[in-house]
Amino acid sequence: VIGITAVDVVGDTRFDRVLQIKEAAKHLPICEAFRTGVASSQSADVPHHDFKVFVAGSSWPPDENIFIPFFNEHKGWRLLIARHVIAEEQLKLILSLIKGKKVVRYTQTTPEEAAEADVLIIDCFGLLSSMYNYGDVAYIGGGFGVGIHNTLEAAVWNMPVIFGPNNKKFQEAQGLLKSGGGFEINTYEDFSGLMSSLMND
């Protein structure tokens, strides 16, 4: 009626791109050892634990002030942190917040050491999208600042995705909230209650 004779159905390039990234995910022996509790170089007799791993991606201090105290108080999970800013002074700040845990840094550790660690800090760029493969729950930083970072890179691995309140302008985050795959937190109490629920699932 309006003169259109040919129509192409085009997908969302954001989703197409993140699926391509997933398919090209890097194998990270250090992250694998961190999750399983055993390095590939170790004897097959060493038991695999398959620890629960919480991946914090592109986090900022307001995010870390919520999730780090929780993991200081709760056992049974391992914490993998990839900050948005990896300046040395910022990494030292994180180290000062972590209490009673064995912490290793990605560029300074081995799979054997990572297998024994409680916290793995990523102190280099280019690994985040591949890291989510080794997690069970993801936290996306920025929600207490200018806005959350990429939620799709985590969601594509079929894990719960947690983020702060500044998410209203992000279509992907809104979709996750509506589908039940995303969770907004505003306070430590929100986070603690949510994690307790996820731990019991």
Language-model region placement:
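Nucleotide-activated sugar donor-binding and catalytic core shared by glycosyltransferases
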Residues: 1-201
